[in-house]
Amino acid sequence: MATKQHQDAPTPTRPKSTNGIINGTKASVGDPRVVVIIYGQGQERIVAVFADVLGKPYRLAARFSEVRGDDQGTVVGIAVGDAKADILSRNRVLLVTINAHCVALGMPPDVDLSAASDYEFLYTESPFFRRDLSRFIAFTLGQISHHEELTTKPRTYFISTTFPDVRTALSNLDILSVGSDAVEIRVDLLREPLPDGSFNPVPSLSYVGEQVMLLRQRTELPIIFTTRCTRENGKFPMDNPELFYQYLYRAIQWGCEYVDVEIWLPEEIRHRLFEQRGNSRIISAFHDFSGTFKWASPQAQTIFDESRKYGDIVKMITIINSVSENYELEYFRSQIKANNPEGPPLSAVNMGQLGQLSRSLNTVFSPITHPLLPIVAAPGQMSAAEINEALSTMGQLPKKNIYAIGSFRSSPQVTFFEKCFNELGLPHNFTSVDRSGVRGSIESFCHQPGFGGAYLSPALPANQPYIPILSDAARTIGTIDTVVVRGEGASASFIGDNATWKGIRATLTRDFAPSAYQDRAAIILSHSPEDAAPIIFALRSLNIGKMYSAGFKAPGPLAVGVEPFTSIESLQRVDHPFAIISALPSGKSHLVHPLLRHFSSTSRRSTPTIERKGSGGKGKVFLDLANGPRQSDPLAVAEQHGWTAYGVADTSAFTTVETLRLLIGQNVPYSFVRLASGPGLY
């Protein structure tokens, strides 16, 4: 089975995903094709897990020709041995094929099936592997996308793992990735050991695939897949461009969010990868180490024009000989931005110590390092903290006072935010203020010199006269939990936003793709419409179906599609709710127990059994937002009755991630929030 003959046909263009973007735009339905899972010997249960994550039924088939249009909305599993018979003749318009391979079996995946499939999911049956599966399948099917959200950020960064084996980095990855919006795996720096004690000159696809799998298991950040050649400070040989294609195309199949493609590669290969990129994004990369490249020359514009042909982001990296060339780059950057308002965005820096100014001024995917990394990926690379300190020195990052105003213990809050600010090298002060002790209104804080924003707990009503601008989420939900400052001095404006709903949605999609919620029923319990509003908004962003309320009346526009429980009879009309979310006070949280028992699922298991057909999609989610001492543990009750259960600590940590993005414009991963906050904060 020749590799090239089944790689030339591009994956059909996926629908544009909007799940990641701000202001509550609904999750994309994604790729409408029938999902076919190729499974290994004895691994049939992976089909049921895929179905559960997607919220769909499943069945097993003997060959691709048995899968027809009436399988729409069903996950179909085909065994490895059977799939080989007719995978090349499958209907690509009707089917999207994923080769699911368990690396714990001790053998690499079938090379021909890997190349012939649309995507490949490598996994180990670890306790949380379905979270990796959820992220993988939601991304590859176009239900989520990070790129649209990242393009709206004022600054984005990525960190490169320069380890010969990513296992070395995993223990420190929570700290390494603070401030990063993506993590790069440098495939050319990987060293695959051979039985004789030497190393493979080029790491095999199976070894690289496992390294990508390990990285995905330990970070929620998008992955940038890079194979740097010898001429561009890398180790991949340049004598075989088709070798680059094989690895870069496989990165798309593995669901890497970004794929770095060097522009020296033949145009035919770059064009092929761009057409086949699916939901991945191509970084079209140019590097010059000669020292002769000039930003003011016509060559610079020519390289940009060539790069943009097959790139979602253009990256240009050069060596310079004088500090003045940094200013030439800034002029070039301004011209590109002015002449290309629709993009693609330009990431451009000068290498070496002389070029560090350009690293501070670049705003698109600036490559950063960290003191814990063994080597820097390029000369002159800086950490996120060093860039922020440089920006502060230049007056581009003025010192601000950021507040937490509410009813919470100040000591853990201040300590945690100080950890974040120190790790990021930010000059800001953070103060926690008990609202009950505040003299005057919150407005007085907003008008203080150096006010840099605040987050509020409990949230404020959205109709505050001193906060004239509201996000769509805050306006619809009716409350503000974050005050964001845009601009400086007299021209500064205050924007009211709501981060809580994003924390709720992030929690709900940890183990399930957004499609699992589509048109399904949900039950919400709350004593307050204000507490229920962000829950309703989050569920609606996931295309939820009917919502049932208990203990509150849904406010305003959020009331559409929400039916209150008024009697036992109304409860009995609810058929298999997919989610139950309780915002009851901790002293009342036990009231949800009867619902959890009544709607218990006996088919929901951590390791589903497999039959020729299965209902799938019967997974159920319970989220308890109560904070404080309880009479009993509703999470334990939920898990005993087959629910996937989450507590307020999960949602609070995800909400903190979103709050920090709003207040300081930088990314602090969920894993670091949980690590650094300790038991005293949540």
PLM regions with names:
Residues 2-223, 227-233, 238, 247-253, ...:
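Alpha/beta catalytic barrel-like cores
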Residues 38-45, 401-409, 492-502, 508-556:
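Glycine-rich adenosine-cofactor-binding loop
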Residues 67-92, 264-401:
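Catalytic alpha/beta core domains of metabolic enzymes, predominantly
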Residues 81, 162, 182-190, 201, ...:
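Catalytic beta/alpha-barrel core
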Residues 86-91, 216, 274-277, 516-517, ...:
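Short, conserved loop/helix-junction motifs that constitute active-site signature segments
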Residues 400-513, 629-637:
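Phosphate/diphosphate ligand-binding glycine-rich loop within oxidoreductases
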Residues 513, 616-682:
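Adenosine-phosphate binding glycine-rich loop
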Residues 561-646:
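Rossmann-like adenosine-cofactor binding region
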